[in-house]
């Protein structure tokens, strides 16, 4: 869960059977809040780290990567997401506008990702790719 914020996505993934899970955020408050939320929800096997996408180095491979961050960070960090994935891994990204999908898609395809689909709500977009 990149840009985990409160770690709600990592917590949900863990509750649905994913394990182990990793949650990373650049903000110290988010890391502290994530740890608290994980404890409040009674889940285990979620490792929380403070940092940017470089914190992924040496981790994985992951079956699923979730990133809910702005467009520019997603474009910049996508190479690092792919580096911790394996063939068949899924990448879900959100936090950008529907108009940004072509740029996100071009960058993803440069890194060997295949576009699966997108969803839109109030001009906000979420996309799914597979490696």
Regions found by a protein language model. Give the residues of each.
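Conserved SAM/SAH cofactor-binding pocket of Class I
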Residues: 1-57
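Hydrophobic beta-strand segment of the Class I
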Residues: 64-66
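Conserved Rossmann-like nucleotide-cofactor binding loop
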Residues: 29, 72, 99
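A short glycine-rich, Lys/Arg-flanked "PGG" loop and its adjoining helix->strand segment in the class I
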Residues: 75-90
